[in-house]
Amino acid sequence: MTVDRQALGFGYGEHAAYASNPWASRGRLYPEASSPTRSDFQRDRDRIVHTTAFRRLKHKTQVFIAADGDHYRTRLTHTIEVAQIARALARALNLDEDLAEGVALVHDFGHTPFGHTGEDALDEVLKPYGGFDHNAQSLRIVTKLERRYAEFDGLNLTWESLEGLVKHNGPLTTADGQGLRGPVSQPILDYCALHDLELASFASLEAQVAAIADDIAYNTHDIDDGLRAGYLTFEMLEEIPFLARLMYEVRDRYPGLESSRFTHEIMRRQITAMVEDVIGVSQRGLADVRPASARDVRCAGRVIATFSDEMSETDRQIKNLLMTRIYRHPEVMRVREGAASIVTDLYRAFMDDPSLMKEHYWIDQIAGMEEPARARHVGDYLAGMTDTFAISVHRRLFDHTPDLR
């Protein structure tokens, strides 16, 4: 049966000339026939959502250990919030919403259990073998470690989705291949040898809005969680002029508002103000650069979707507040130390005895491997663990208190 794509409207919304065009994608590593009902970027987004890696985000820490309360953000809730903001920005700028959403949904796939603490611990033990980088791990997951399809490993995402995943925070190299922020992780270089992601150029606008959406979501929900946990107070927020103005506005309009509603009214205004700031800056940037294609965006030599100077200063102030009052809070630091020990202990145990990993796939893969390859596979296994699973396995291996396990 023949399907009229334009009548369906799939992927044919109003796109600006500078938007990524799903019907002119640079393709997939393994060629596939197009879908009659979904654009290539829609298929990418759908594949991302149906992965085990996406489901695991539910039990991975954002800032607070997930077991400390059901109302704090996890990697999954953070990812959903980022995707919502990215899609709103993409719609406002006439970009491809599916690509922006897909990049937002996949951007945290490579995070370890226990957030950045777990990543730092895993990077430390893997330093002799190239270290660990969550962005490179995200690429490994979607190009190799997700094993769902009969014809290929990974998800076989489009070039544009993979480019956005790898470069959403900007170019990785100079034109002559020198790393801009240190050496480029080997998994990224290995993939680029097969499917060049052009590491020296900027990413699409869709990837840029996903990146700035990540900042907006972080700034907002970490304040919300910090207030809920008692690490932040409204008085602390008032030290930042931007937040003080929002608080004055809410108090003026809703005098005597209860704390939880007061917090929500501040947060929703913060998101709105930051989103509108990015839209305004992006529109001015587009007027300056005048890109006639997505290629022109990549060659612009600058980020287009970003904060204004004033909002960038607010962003800096908020991040400083979060660092001093939350991320370095004694209780958070105590939990971080324990989390780092769990990752380090498990790595050493699995390297000494791979059979402790239980899953036959991982054990079979490691058999007969040289140490560098074995270390990378153990790193893959550890990075894929959720907080709850890592704690459970560590308790089974290292806590000798008798119980039923």
From Swiss-Prot:
Domain of life: Bacteria
Annotated InterPro entries: dGTPase, Diverse_Catalytic_Enzymes, dNTPase_2, HD/PDEase_dom, HD_domain, PHydrolase_assoc_dom
Keyword Hydrolase: yes
Keyword DNA-binding among record annotations: no
Location of the HD domain: 75-219
Keywords: Hydrolase
PROSITE patterns to which the protein is assigned, alphabetical: HD (PS51831)
GO molecular function: triphosphoric monoester hydrolase activity
UniProt-listed Pfam families: HD, HD_assoc
Sequence similarity: Belongs to the dGTPase family. Type 2 subfamily.
Protein name (record): Deoxyguanosinetriphosphate triphosphohydrolase-like protein
Native source species: Sinorhizobium medicae (strain WSM419)
